[in-house]
A protein has these predicted regions:
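Membrane-anchoring hydrophobic segments
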Residues: 1-78
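Ferredoxin-reductase
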Residues: 176-266, 308, 315-317, 328, ...
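Juxtamembrane/interfacial segments around transmembrane helices
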Residues: 58-61, 80-88, 146-160, 178-189, ...
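Long, contiguous hydrophobic alpha-helical segments, chiefly transmembrane helices and signal peptides
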Residues: 37-38, 43-44, 55-56, 61, ...
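FNR/FR-type flavoprotein reductase catalytic core
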Residues: 6-9, 13, 64-172, 239, ...
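Generic structural "secondary-structure junction" signal
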Residues: 57, 235, 276-278
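Membrane-interface capping segments at transmembrane-helix boundaries
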Residues: 48-49, 114-115, 171-180
Length: 377
């Protein structure tokens, strides 16, 4: 399992927490685990390259991030009920109760996220940091000298608390300012069909990436969210970078309808571990809809193909397909590139039960989650 280092990091954190609290204050095991889980939640949200490497992909980091945040809420609610509620005259209890209610409110907002504007959801989400600070006040005021004198417990709690505080501070106050070192502007826009647009960007310095990766893009144009959004890289070289964006929400609709040449942008770095270059000499590519983007990136970077590739591109109707001319041209110039176009309106859905997958081939898939789950069975 390629994400084994990341899982070891999470499991070791919880085991260390259990052993430390058992040897000192076992009655506080549940809130101790909640504190560790919350700290891990903030750490996992930093998008640090080391974490992405440990978990073999940012999407896996996000999956564990969701797990630790949900686990934190469950542990805090259980702690609240086991203590008979936290309302009381002591200030420490008040801090604890405030933290729990903010956390629960954020969870409700997370479930309602698709019904509110992303920018509003993002700012509400930041209240978690305030709740985390309240929670730390609660822990240190309740535990007193056990956490204020140097011992294994105080070292463990202090270390995770400090890492959580630093991670949260970085996410909220620093990431937007220092996390996007590649500045640039839009030099060309192309509408590929009725809902998909290609963006060409000229950056202030060369951008390193590998075909199959994605990056977070910030757009500085009136009427656009200030928050960064992830998009697959569809090509580029040196200071030129391409993104292909499908209209699938408020932000992407705004890009399709209103984005203008000359607008300033910034990019953080390349993410993702679907590195086509690292695959075997015999490969199978499977793309659905806008999932063709990472493969287009590879095609643009490798005009002469040095691998045997079977490429299956599935789309629903010719009006929804993109880059068809480019694919046909590439297939003509590269005999070892076998192109299979699958129009689900005419040919039904892509099915490999009757199709032969070459032995010892690297298989890469990108597209709708339902398609990938179906083909992975």
């Amino acid at each position: 399992m390629k994400s084994i280092k990341g899982l070891h990091f999470i499991i070791a954190s919880f085991i260390l927490t259990i052993l430390t609290w058992m040897n000192t204050s076992p009655q506080f095991m549940i809130p101790g685990l909640a504190l560790t889980s919350l700290s891990l939640t903030f750490i996992l949200a930093t998008r640090l390259p080391l974490l992405e490497s440990w978990f073999h992909g940012l999407e896996k980091v996000y999956t564990v991030h969701k797990f630790t945040s949900f686990l934190s809420i469950i542990l805090l609610i259980f702690h609240n009920f086991s203590m008979g509620g936290l309302w009381g005259s002591r200030l420490a209890a008040q801090f604890g109760n405030l933290a729990i209610y903010i956390f629960v409110s954020i969870i409700l907002v997370a479930y309602l996220g698709k019904y509110i504007q992303y920018e509003a959801w993002r700012w509400i989400h930041r209240l978690v940091y305030l709740a985390y600070i309240f929670g730390l006040f609660h822990v240190y005021m309740m535990m007193g000298n056990r956490l204020l004198t140097f011992n294994l417990l105080s070292f463990l709690v202090g270390s995770y608390a400090l890492l959580g505080l630093l991670a949260g501070f970085y996410i909220i106050f620093l990431y937007q300012k220092i996390g996007f070192p590649y500045l640039g502007k839009i030099t060309n826009l192309k509408r590929l069909n009725h809902d998909t647009r290609e963006i060409q960007i000229h950056l202030s310095r060369p951008f390193d990436y590998q075909s199959g990766q994605f990056a977070f893009l910030k757009i500085f144009q009136e009427g656009f969210e200030s928050a960064p959004h992830p998009f697959s890289i569809s090509g580029g070289h040196g200071q030129t970078l391409y993104f292909t964006v499908k209209n699938s929400g408020d932000h992407t609709k705004n890009i399709y309808d209103n984005l203008q040449v000359g607008s300033k942008v910034s990019v953080d770095r390349a993410y993702g571990h679907m590195i086509i270059e690292e695959g075997r000499e015999n490969q199978v590519w499977i793309a659905g809809g806008i999932g063709i983007t990472p493969f287009i990136s590879y095609i643009r970077e490798h005009p002469i193909l040095d691998k045997q590739v079977h490429f299956y591109y599935s789309f629903r109707g010719e009006e929804n397909a993109v880059y068809i001319d480019l694919l046909h041209d590439y297939a003509q110039k590269n005999p070892n590139f076998e192109l299979h176009l699958v129009d689900s309106r005419k040919d039904a859905y892509l099915n490999f039960e009757q199709k032969e997958v070459p032995e010892h081939a690297s298989v890469y898939m990108c597209g709708p989650l339902s398609m990938m789950k179906s083909l992975a069975k």
